[in-house]
UniProtKB/Swiss-Prot annotation:
PANTHER family: TRANSLATION INITIATION FACTOR IF-1, CHLOROPLASTIC
Name the UniProt record assigns to this protein: Translation initiation factor IF-1
Keywords attached to this entry: Cytoplasm, Initiation factor, Protein biosynthesis, RNA-binding, rRNA-binding
Principal place of residence: cytoplasm
GO molecular function, one term: rRNA binding
Gene: infA
Keyword presence, Aminoacyl-tRNA synthetase: no
Length: 72
Protein backbone atom coordinates (compact mmCIF):
# COMPACT_ATOMS: atom_id res chain seq x y z
CA UNK A 1 0.00 0.00 0.00
CA UNK A 2 1.46 3.35 -0.96
CA UNK A 3 1.17 6.40 1.26
CA UNK A 4 -1.18 8.08 -1.23
CA UNK A 5 -3.76 5.32 -0.71
CA UNK A 6 -3.99 5.88 3.05
CA UNK A 7 -6.95 7.77 4.53
CA UNK A 8 -5.81 10.28 7.17
CA UNK A 9 -8.33 11.19 9.89
CA UNK A 10 -8.30 12.89 13.29
CA UNK A 11 -8.85 10.79 16.42
CA UNK A 12 -8.67 10.87 20.22
CA UNK A 13 -6.77 8.20 22.16
CA UNK A 14 -9.11 6.27 24.47
CA UNK A 15 -6.83 3.70 26.08
CA UNK A 16 -3.32 2.31 25.71
CA UNK A 17 -2.89 -1.40 24.95
CA UNK A 18 0.20 -3.63 25.09
CA UNK A 19 2.88 -3.51 22.37
CA UNK A 20 2.49 0.19 21.50
CA UNK A 21 -1.13 -0.29 20.39
CA UNK A 22 -3.90 2.16 21.22
CA UNK A 23 -7.68 2.17 21.01
CA UNK A 24 -8.66 5.45 19.34
CA UNK A 25 -12.02 7.04 18.58
CA UNK A 26 -12.35 8.71 15.20
CA UNK A 27 -14.29 11.93 14.58
CA UNK A 28 -17.25 9.87 13.34
CA UNK A 29 -17.37 7.96 16.71
CA UNK A 30 -15.95 4.70 15.30
CA UNK A 31 -13.30 2.98 17.41
CA UNK A 32 -10.24 1.43 15.78
CA UNK A 33 -6.96 -0.14 16.89
CA UNK A 34 -3.89 1.89 15.99
CA UNK A 35 -0.16 1.35 16.39
CA UNK A 36 2.57 3.98 16.62
CA UNK A 37 4.49 4.70 13.41
CA UNK A 38 8.19 3.90 13.29
CA UNK A 39 9.41 7.52 13.28
CA UNK A 40 7.32 8.37 16.33
CA UNK A 41 8.64 5.29 18.12
CA UNK A 42 12.24 6.14 17.15
CA UNK A 43 11.90 9.71 18.47
CA UNK A 44 10.21 8.58 21.73
CA UNK A 45 6.99 10.53 21.17
CA UNK A 46 4.77 9.86 24.20
CA UNK A 47 1.07 9.23 23.59
CA UNK A 48 -1.36 9.40 26.51
CA UNK A 49 -5.13 8.86 26.80
CA UNK A 50 -6.97 12.01 25.71
CA UNK A 51 -4.34 13.08 23.16
CA UNK A 52 -5.53 14.21 19.73
CA UNK A 53 -3.71 12.29 17.00
CA UNK A 54 -3.68 11.89 13.22
CA UNK A 55 -4.36 8.31 12.14
CA UNK A 56 -3.75 6.75 8.71
CA UNK A 57 -6.27 4.05 7.76
CA UNK A 58 -5.79 1.52 5.00
CA UNK A 59 -8.65 1.40 2.49
CA UNK A 60 -8.47 -2.41 2.76
CA UNK A 61 -8.94 -2.69 6.55
CA UNK A 62 -10.74 0.22 8.20
CA UNK A 63 -10.54 -1.35 11.69
CA UNK A 64 -6.77 -0.83 12.06
CA UNK A 65 -4.60 2.23 11.64
CA UNK A 66 -1.24 3.89 12.22
CA UNK A 67 -0.74 6.94 14.45
CA UNK A 68 1.39 9.37 12.44
CA UNK A 69 1.17 12.63 14.43
CA UNK A 70 0.34 13.79 17.97
CA UNK A 71 -1.12 17.29 18.26
CA UNK A 72 -0.05 19.54 21.13
Amino acid sequence: MSKEDAIEVMAVVIEPLPNAMFKVELENKHQVLAHVSGKMRKNFIRILPGDRVAVELSPYDLTRGRIVYRYK
